[in-house]
Structures are given as structure tokens and as C-alpha cells.
UniProtKB/Swiss-Prot annotation:
Entry-linked HAMAP family: Transcrip_reg_TACO1 (MF_00693), Transcrip_reg_TACO1_YeeN (MF_00918)
Protein family: Belongs to the TACO1 family. YeeN subfamily.
A matching Pfam family: TACO1_YebC_N
Biological processes per GO annotation: regulation of DNA-templated transcription
Entry protein name: Probable transcriptional regulatory protein LMOf2365_0385
Keywords, ordered alphabetically: Cytoplasm, DNA-binding, Transcription, Transcription regulation
């Protein structure tokens, strides 16, 4: 297992600077998920996944409901899911996931963010092979041993369960996200501090001085882009 969730949180904290930005990004993601299938989350697994994620970020119910209602309308606004891979200073690797209604605009914006901040865009696959796509759940009130026993009782295998930062973190295969979540809910666990599918780096690197400063500016520039939903990287950031 690469970087633990305790370290990943430090990366995520830089992205989640304002509630308004979180809500806006989830609003689009929920709209797209609802528009691409049934607007009922019980009948749309993708929509249900996004809503569960939104709840861990305390996205208000009216934001979720508004996005779903918009998807029920007659508008035909089309969004594309895009992934960009690239490099920052001194061996740092970055993956950018975007959701956009204008592919050319997003590609140009991402490319400019890289070039203006000392980074370089890579080709598809140039970085992703150094990351593991992983389902992650955070549960408070139970330790790793208790969760392992619960999951064994419902015959669900996971990659690992670790006690981290006052909570138990479950790492599972991404395709098992819903199975693990439903198994936990069947065992009486309804609330999650984390419910994500993340790209976890297989190995972390540390940056310092000017390299770290350049890297942080690059990440900020990417995360500030309207169409960017998630940014993953392999740099270990301090608390």
C-alpha cells in the first residue's frame, strides 16, 4: 500500500479551500451522473456513489436535490470526463481529472497551468501506472480488527484495514466500492468520514525549498481551474 489516508488528506486539504467551490464541483458531478442515467439514486449506482461522496464533504441536501432536478429537465448540456497526466519539479507526478462541457477550453487551461508553473504535460499512461486506483472508506467508532471481522462475516475481501488518525480506514478494489459499502451498511454502519475512489501513489517523494514552492503553485493553479474535479500526486506533504 502506498501513501496512507492520513497523508492523502493533506493533499486534499489544499483543494478544499472553500465550501462554495466544493458545492459547485459536486453540483456538476451530481448533474452529470443523474443526466447519464436514472435521476433516482436507488436505480443509478453512479449517482448514488457521487451522493455518498458529497455527504462526506457535508454538501447540503438542497445542493444535491437542485442538481438532480436540473438533470430531470430538457436541457442537453453535455459533459465529458477527461484525465490529464503530467510532471512537476524533481520527479513529482500529477494526475488531473476534469469534467467539462468544453474540451478545448479545459485542455488549454490545464496545459497553461502546467507550462506557467514549471510543469510538463505527459501523454496518457505516462503517470497513471505509478498509482493504484483504490476504494477508501473511513469509519469512526470501530477499529480495524472489528471492521475486518464484520467484513469477514459478510464474505467481503478488502486490500487492507488500518487504524489511522482516530478512525479505521478500509482500502479495497475500486470495483468493490458498492459491495463493501453495502456490506458495512448491512452491519449497521451508516456514516462514513471517507467514501472515495482515489488514485494512490505507489511511492511518495519529498520536495523541499524551491522545488516544493513550485510544486505547490502548480497544484494550486490546477485545482483552481473550474473544470478540474480532482488532482492526485505523489508528493508527501507535511501537516
Amino acid at each position: 500500500m502506498g501513501r496512507k489516508w492520513a497523508n492523502i488528506k493533506e493533499k486534499k486539504a489544499s483543494k478544499d479551500k472553500t465550501n462554495s467551490r466544493i458545492y459547485a464541483k459536486f453540483g456538476i458531478e451530481i448533474y452529470v451522473a443523474a443526466k447519464s442515467g436514472d435521476p433516482d439514486p436507488h436505480a443509478n449506482q453512479k449517482l448514488r456513489f457521487v451522493i455518498e461522496r458529497a455527504k462526506t464533504y457535508n454538501v447540503p441536501k438542497h445542493i444535491i436535490d437542485r442538481a438532480i432536478e436540473k438533470a430531470k429537465g430538457t436541457g442537453d448540456e453535455t459533459y465529458s470526463e477527461l484525465r490529464y497526466e503530467g510532471f512537476g519539479p524533481n520527479g513529482s507526478m500529477i494526475i488531473v481529472d476534469a469534467l467539462t462541457n468544453n474540451v478545448n477550453r479545459t485542455a488549454s487551461d490545464v496545459r497553461a497551468a502546467y507550462s506557467k508553473n514549471g510543469g510538463n504535460m505527459g501523454v496518457s499512461g505516462s503517470v497513471a501506472y505509478m498509482f493504484d486506483n483504490t476504494a477508501i472508506f473511513g469509519v469512526e467508532g470501530k477499529d480495524a480488527d472489528e471492521l475486518l471481522e464484520l467484513l469477514m462475516e459478510v464474505d467481503i475481501d478488502v486490500r487492507d484495514i488500518l487504524d489511522e488518525d482516530g478512525q479505521a480506514i478500509i482500502y479495497a478494489e475500486p470495483e468493490d466500492f458498492h459491495k463493501v459499502q453495502e456490506g458495512l451498511k448491512a452491519a449497521g454502519i451508516e456514516e462514513f468520514t471517507v467514501a472515495e475512489i482515489e488514485m494512490i501513489p505507489q511511492n511518495d517523494i519529498q520536495l523541499s525549498g524551491e522545488d516544493l514552492e513550485k510544486f505547490e503553485k502548480l497544484i494550486d493553479a490546477l485545482e483552481d481551474l473550474e473544470d478540474v474535479q480532482k488532482v492526485y500526486h505523489n508528493v508527501e506533504l507535511e501537516d
